[in-house]
């Protein structure tokens, strides 16, 4: 199976320019290709992972990746399928984000070894020194307004309004392709399907200005089986930065993927062979309640993004929380697992009665309700039920002298810190 056939079999090719010419280019020898990442935040997220892993697959097949971080285009803002104008960031902010994103990309692509080792580039290197007049004369003249207006990303914004800044973005992305081709012989661009218009601006510029052919592959924007945009949890992006989305949170995200999506995501997000995935799929279909596909998915992706140790910690936390054995976890583990849970700080020597504590920490709305909660067995301290109205917290309830977890009912957790 060729690399192009494998990408197709994994569902990683949404659209291409001339497919026959592209297949021929892969067959004739190593292809130099690039993927662009605009610094719109201080971290990449799961949505970026599809293109990143596609780049890694091509590198493993012998092709040479260029990872372009948009130090210049990040200052402008891509209008593609955004309902409103993006807020412009300061140069200092974008530079900081560029540095962080470069560090994240180095986890997935090999920048050290072989003739096809990855190369990191920043488009500020060429845009930073070009004058506005030169850009209009040397690049702008190759794009008609009619051509630019025909792009879906622009059409959608015409009625609500689009600034010239964002309107010109597609020319900048097109020029990236031209520069990378001239400097490094790059002939292929890979990106999300929402980037098709911007990406083909690059092939158009190559054709008109240099009389050369360029290729484009778009990877699909991943949605779940309900059509919901993938890569967000409770409305928030699942980040690749462990300080923004912990390995435990990422593990839980994959563990809770819907059954109908799990095997498909194994093809997209893991490096397991298609044969292995087929076998996992068969076993999974025999007993979906055991969630084999989700467990393998969580193992593979968390290990890939954060390492084996982080994966094992996420599993340990999950198992102990499920068993209600909170005292088997460290305060650090619990803080990771309960990130975002309401927290109440009390003095280490404050000996509050359980009823007073529940009211003061706003766990129960009133003393009457607090007493009922305790008597009805709805209150748990570190996983153990408390039904004694005279119960007072002691040092044994303080995990690592740092934290106590109180649960009200089945799911409402609260954290006490000292």
UniProtKB/Swiss-Prot annotation:
L-tyrosine binds at residues 34, 169, 173. It catalyses: tRNA(Tyr) + L-tyrosine + ATP = L-tyrosyl-tRNA(Tyr) + AMP + diphosphate + H(+). The keyword Zinc does not apply. A motif ('HIGH' region) lies at residues 39-48. ATP binds at residue 232. One of its GO terms (molecular function) is RNA binding. Residues 352-418 form the S4 RNA-binding domain. One of its GO terms (biological process) is tyrosyl-tRNA aminoacylation. Transmembrane segments: none annotated. Its EC number is 6.1.1.1. A motif ('KMSKS' region) lies at residues 229-233. Its main location: cytoplasm. It is found in: Cytoplasm. The keyword RNA-binding applies. GO terms for cellular component: cytosol. Keywords: Aminoacyl-tRNA synthetase, ATP-binding, Cytoplasm, Ligase, Nucleotide-binding, Protein biosynthesis, RNA-binding. Homodimer. Catalyzes the attachment of tyrosine to tRNA(Tyr) in a two-step reaction: tyrosine is first activated by ATP to form Tyr-AMP and then transferred to the acceptor end of tRNA(Tyr). HAMAP family: Tyr_tRNA_synth_type1. Belongs to the class-I aminoacyl-tRNA synthetase family. TyrS type 1 subfamily. This is Tyrosine--tRNA ligase. It comes from Streptococcus thermophilus (strain ATCC BAA-491 / LMD-9).
